[in-house]
């Protein structure tokens, strides 16, 4: 673990807060105000997809229209009467908010409306000069209508409301057209705004719905002109549209909306605060992997100067994230953990807009908090006994221990000390779903148990191994966390080859005492080897003795260099009953491939390291698990050991008169010769 020290981390964490001020802005929008409120269903249905959309911004507001007196000079007393649209909260604050919007003077409105009213039919409701009382305000998307497009004069549009118009089924269509045209001629309404109101009236009155906001060829919504002829009827729809048969009073007004960092998505914020245009090597961050409360990113060298800002943006946009870490080096350790820096940390004292935000603290016990299991407390106690133990390192360990839920199970993951990949959750589920109660699972590279724990919970007898002692310890923690029976999951901490040569061998050949766990299997034996960078190399334990090569023994961990890794599977004990050997044991081996023919290459990698050719009937399944890189895939080959292997093993039994490996030396040699042609993955891409 290469986490930053407390002092440097705290100092660098002060800088990112300034980015929030840099993204603050105010946007002027066109707003449609209407009453009565009972028309909301019909109007909002018509406006669906046309409203302003931004995170943390309400596009439909409850407002109160109240009269106020203008302080301007040169007007009559009557012309000084104006209207302000206040939200309830703003009304309580005496209208001091930036959101208080003033309407045009009454005299200006009456001048245009009186002309239209004189020619209206007796059945047409009287046109109001001002909206008063409770109203609804809908913020319109700028692609539909901009605030500067409300009136022909942009300066006037930014300061005043338009006149009040009557729309709907209770209003004669010719009257609507005349009042809109009069407002356009008087310079109180732009043609684009008039077109929009005409379209709203047609929809409210039940006219042709094709006279509406339509989509241009590029998919953007564009307002169309006033109707001149009847259009084709709308296509039938299964959705019931809300209807309103009364008159609706509407007006347009500009609305100032304050935007802060909460109004933007993570990708939008990063594109705003990072100088992407100034640096060609600086590209937008594609995303992150989340493991419990931890967000994991892989930053390039160009991103590193902005690591603290990136960490803060991730925290601000993801409430479930408390810690952000950056992968410093590639995975190179035999324990498969990687070095990381903490670039973002949400403290319990952090606040957003004055509100305290709950999160992790460096003194926390990670996400587990006070709910540690007995096995986890034991693991922590053992760590404290280490000669290299330090309180600061222990705090970091607790901070980076996450709780992950997957496949109906909970996993405690010490993320900085074990290997965990959340992108493999589907594969964990897929493989466990193949198993049935009564099966036995041998997980050679088990990690903290993403295969082992759900399989044991399903009723499968599990023998799980990992070379990493921390992973082995946390398998026990996760067994306790998921309330597994004591005999359901057996944990081992040894080299994978030793596990194959001991635990698996005694179970498959029934060489152990019948009373030992794993000897009896009423279902099928499964062997998982999920270490795609080098898992196929562990298959050398099954090679015939004649094909043993130096690299196999050189790569063996925690074993004598002089030992022959495949000796156990080439010498069958005399007391073993050949008929009791389980030849149906199914191996699931993972590897990487960059070849054009992924399936052929994956099988070839297995054959090269196994030392035997796999007949088609022994290959049960070969599939691509996921994309690792543009030209690199993770593969899984599920197979049983071929007849040639079992024939060689039986020939090695004392008293059979055979020489192990002799009958198949030619096949094995041929495979070993082409080993260099097999696609090998680099260990740092595990």
UniProtKB/Swiss-Prot annotation:
It is found in: Mitochondrion matrix; Nucleus; Cytoplasm. One of its GO terms (molecular function) is tRNA (guanine(37)-N1)-methyltransferase activity. S-adenosyl-L-methionine binds at residues 428, 466-467, 495-496, 530. It is an enzyme of class 2 (transferase). Signal peptide: none annotated. Its EC number is 2.1.1.228. Keywords: Cytoplasm, Methyltransferase, Mitochondrion, Nucleus, S-adenosyl-L-methionine, Transferase, tRNA processing. SUPFAM superfamilies: S-adenosyl-L-methionine-dependent methyltransferases. Specifically methylates the N1 position of guanosine-37 in various cytoplasmic and mitochondrial tRNAs. Methylation is not dependent on the nature of the nucleoside 5' of the target nucleoside. This is the first step in the biosynthesis of wybutosine (yW), a modified base adjacent to the anticodon of tRNAs and required for accurate decoding. PANTHER family: TRNA (GUANINE(37)-N1)-METHYLTRANSFERASE 2, TRNA METHYLTRANSFERASE. Belongs to the class I-like SAM-binding methyltransferase superfamily. TRM5/TYW2 family. Monomer. This is tRNA (guanine(37)-N(1))-methyltransferase.
């Amino acid at each position: 673990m290469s986490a930053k020290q407390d002092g440097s981390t705290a100092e660098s964490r002060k800088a990112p807060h300034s980015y929030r001020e840099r993204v603050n802005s105010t946007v002027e929008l066109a707003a449609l105000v209407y009453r009565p409120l009972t028309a909301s269903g019909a109007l909002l249905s018509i406006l669906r997809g046309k409203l302003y959309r931004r995170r943390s911004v309400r596009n439909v507001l409850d407002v109160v229209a109240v009269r106020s007196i203008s302080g301007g000079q040169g007007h009559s007393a009557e012309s000084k009467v104006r209207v302000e649209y206040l939200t309830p909260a703003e009304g309580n604050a005496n209208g001091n908010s930036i959101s208080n919007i003033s309407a045009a003077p009454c005299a200006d409105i009456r001048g245009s409306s009186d002309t239209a009213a004189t020619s209206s039919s007796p059945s047409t409701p009287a046109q109001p000069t001002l909206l008063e009382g409770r109203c609804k305000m809908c913020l319109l998307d700028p692609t539909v209508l901009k605030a500067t497009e409300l009136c022909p004069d942009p300066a006037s549009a930014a300061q005043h409301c338009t006149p009040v118009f009557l729309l709907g089924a209770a209003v004669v269509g010719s009257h609507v057209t005349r009042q809109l045209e009069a407002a356009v001629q008087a310079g109180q309404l732009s043609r684009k705004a008039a077109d929009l109101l005409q379209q709203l009236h047609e929809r409210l009155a039940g006219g042709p719905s094709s006279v509406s906001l339509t989509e241009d060829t590029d998919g953007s919504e564009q307002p169309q002109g006033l109707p001149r002829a009847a259009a084709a009827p709308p296509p039938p729809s299964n959705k019931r549209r809300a209807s309103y048969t009364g008159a609706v009073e509407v007006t347009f007004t500009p609305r100032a909306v304050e935007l802060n960092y909460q109004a933007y998505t993570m990708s939008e914020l990063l594109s705003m605060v990072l100088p992407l245009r100034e640096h060609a090597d600086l590209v937008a961050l594609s995303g992150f992997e989340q493991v419990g409360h931890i967000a994991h990113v892989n930053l390039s060298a160009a991103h590193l100067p902005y690591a603290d800002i990136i960490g803060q943006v991730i925290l601000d946009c993801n409430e479930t994230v408390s810690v952000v870490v950056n992968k410093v080096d590639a995975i190179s350790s035999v324990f498969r953990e990687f070095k990381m820096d903490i670039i973002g940390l949400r403290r319990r004292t952090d606040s957003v807009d004055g509100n305290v935000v709950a999160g992790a603290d460096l003194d926390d016990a990670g996400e587990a908090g006070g709910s540690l299991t007995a096995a986890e407390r034991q693991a922590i106690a053992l760590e404290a006994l280490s000669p290299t133990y330090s309180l600061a390192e222990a705090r970091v360990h607790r901070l980076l221990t996450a709780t992950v839920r997957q496949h109906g199970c909970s996993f405690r993951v010490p993320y900085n000390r074990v290997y965990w990949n959340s992108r493999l959750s589907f594969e964990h589920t897929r493989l466990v779903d193949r198993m049935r109660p009564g099966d036995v699972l041998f997980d050679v590279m088990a990690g903290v148990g993403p295969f082992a724990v759900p399989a044991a919970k399903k009723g499968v007898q599990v023998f799980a191994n990992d070379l990493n002692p921390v992973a082995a310890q946390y398998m026990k923690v996760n067994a306790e966390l998921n309330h597994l029976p004591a005999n359901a999951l057996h944990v081992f901490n040894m080299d994978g080859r030793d596990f194959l040569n001991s635990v698996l061998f005694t179970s498959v050949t029934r060489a152990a005492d019948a009373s030992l766990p794993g000897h009896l299997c009423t279902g099928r034996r499964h062997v998982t080897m999920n270490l795609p960078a080098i898992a196929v190399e562990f298959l050398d334990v099954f090679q015939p003795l004649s094909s043993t090569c130096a690299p196999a023994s050189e790569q063996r961990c925690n074993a004598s260099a002089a030992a022959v890794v495949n000796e156990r599977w080439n010498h069958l004990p005399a007391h073993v009953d050949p008929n009791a050997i389980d030849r149906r044991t199914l191996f699931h081996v993972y590897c990487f491939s960059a070849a054009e023919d992924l399936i052929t290459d994956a099988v070839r990698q297995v054959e090269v390291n196994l030392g035997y050719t796999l007949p088609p009937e022994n290959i049960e399944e070969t599939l691509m698990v996921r994309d690792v890189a543009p030209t690199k895939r993770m593969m899984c080959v599920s197979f049983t050991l071929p007849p040639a292997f079992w024939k060689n093993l039986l020939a090695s039994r004392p008293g059979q008169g055979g020489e192990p490996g002799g009958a198949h030396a030619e096949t094995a040699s041929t495979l070993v010769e082409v080993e260099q042609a097999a696609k090998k993955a680099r260990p740092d891409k595990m």
